[in-house]
Amino acid sequence: MEKSKGQMKSRLSYAAGAFGNDVFYATLSTYFIMFVTTHLFNTGDPKQNSHYVLLITNIISILRILEVFIDPLIGNMIDNTNTKYGKFKPWVVGGGIISSITLLLLFTDLGGLNKTNPFLYLVLFGIIYLVMDVFYSIKDIGFWSMIPALSLDSHEREKMATFARIGSTIGANIVGVAIMPIVLFFSMTNNSGSGDKSGWFWFAFIVALIGVITSIAVGIGTREVESKIRDNNEKTSLKQVFKVLGQNDQLMWLSLGYWFYGLGINTLNALQLYYFTFILGDSGKYSILYGLNTVVGLVSVSLFPTLADKFNRKRLFYGCIAVMLGGIGIFSIAGTSLPIILTAAELFFIPQPLVFLVVFMIISDSVEYGQWKTGHRDESLTLSVRPLIDKLGGAMSNWLVSTFAVAAGMTTGASASTITTHQQFIFKLGMFAFPAATMLIGAFIVARKITLTEARHAKIVEELEHRFSVATSENEVKANVVSLVTPTTGYLVDLSSVNDEHFASGSMGKGFAIKPTDGAVFAPISGTIRQILPTRHAVGIESEDGVIVLIHVGIGTVKLNGEGFISYVEQGDRVEVGQKLLEFWSPIIEKNGLDDTVLVTVTNSEKFSAFHLEQKVGEKVEALSEVITFKKGE
């Protein structure tokens, strides 16, 4: 009971942290630029205002690109941290507090310096923005790196990630719901629906307060688990990231396509508030849009597994792009009709979480593709590519948003009534034509260059399994006699009779099979986990004597991509005989027309001259019963 309460406290605290993290990020990446373009400078000269706005935007873009080069240093700094409070929590709490305070400063004119001494203001703005950005990165990297440190249980990690995803989704969308009501409530003047500096300051104050409170909640409510397998992590450099990109063509082309896609959607998303303020003329209605987005986003994510199974990822991706382009087309002619605007905006928004998940899954699959192609596994480096692309795209889209807003006259003092037809046309080119073009470029790259389908990935994983067996078949064995116990309860099957060519032929090593009656899989020998596939259906263990044992649950189960499997171990873990390794659910395997037979082999069985089954084929054997003995010749 105490453990359950502790886990729930940790999940809720981590979800709160994700909520605060995305409230902060949405404010910084989408809404801060609105404050800069419409409220920060009011010199009385529109050209001078636009000049300063573009200078500020250039500073922001340069600093955000610079952050890409700083991030690996931050990651290595966090990796080398060792305090009594843990590795990550000090950075999450400290980074959250400092970044929140500096964000609040950015929503001010620094005591009127922007008027009395614009040059000094720009210098101080750059310094404060850099401090804010660096400490937000420290918090962000530390926060999202915490999950492996909060539990060694794969199942608990998945629950933790689910809680975080919910908190993140709500946080990202609730800002859109609340921003204009808060800004207008605290503003002294309405300014045609865009509020004033006072309103934006108090909005930033609330965001900063949420950032501080949720960061502290993570520090108090979570507990990092000590484990030797978390020590000596490989350090990541930007050079290594680009090296991995160069060696992994699927990752490289997907990253390029995703960058073009992200540039388009980030630009359009950030310009929506401008549309509601300067085209529709009612910024308060923007809350309705993001209220819908919050609900629709959660539903969209929940439908992903079903849609991916029915259409496959690439078809789902193309379908999403088509729906989004349709939404852009309708949005471009919606004018001031709120029902049409909301319909178009939702058509554009609904597929976005699905596209993100498609891209994330292909990037995850490219880990095995890269391993298959180069012979070494670069998991952390491969997965670090997406955040890198997001940041580069975000920096560019911020610059574009500012440029389009200035070109359309949507700066300090502007309102829907002052925007001319020509300026509306320029704005719509930036908001609709440009994103549509970049999304089409991204989709074209994916269509022409991405060949890593689910089926191909399954074959690659099977090939990696085979390579593991071949690579370890020559491992020297110190012991003369080795006995294995059954990893699960079921009926003993002759390995040569199973419906898998590699296992039946003995090319994966000698061993046995079990037709299971239970879903728990235990270690048949003591040793170290040398391989645990991301699909969680196979585990490789090396004993202290050099014996390599492969436990493979099911035939063709790689196609399930982990569905129906729970892993309790990680690569590098030390396990004892009888320790639970996996759990699987046979109904899911059978529902997909697959065989749930558990296959067990000694991949370096060639080092033994003989083996003997201690149980009769066809008879039921209990888990952890002695089942096979390998012997060397005299």
Swiss-Prot record:
GO function terms (MF aspect): kinase activity; symporter activity
Membrane topology note: Multi-pass membrane protein
Region (Permease): 1-490
Database matches in Gene3D superfamilies: Glucose Permease (Domain IIA), MFS general substrate transporter like domains
E.C. designation(s): 2.7.1.-
CC terms in the record's Gene Ontology section: plasma membrane
Lineage top rank: taxon: Bacteria
Stretches assigned to the PTS EIIA type-1 domain: 500-604
UniProt signal peptide: none
Modified-residue entries (Phosphohistidine), positions: H552
Pfam families: MFS_2, PTS_EIIA_1
Purpose: Responsible for transport of beta-galactosides into the cell, with the concomitant uptake of protons (symport system), and also for transport of homologous and heterologous exchange of beta-galactosides.
Family: In the N-terminal section; belongs to the sodium:galactoside symporter (TC 2.A.2) family.
Matches recorded under PANTHER family: MAJOR FACILITATOR SUPERFAMILY DOMAIN-CONTAINING PROTEIN, MELIBIOSE PERMEASE
Record remark on domains: The PTS EIIA type-1 domain may serve a regulatory function, through its phosphorylation activity.
Protein known as: Lactose permease
Organism: Streptococcus thermophilus
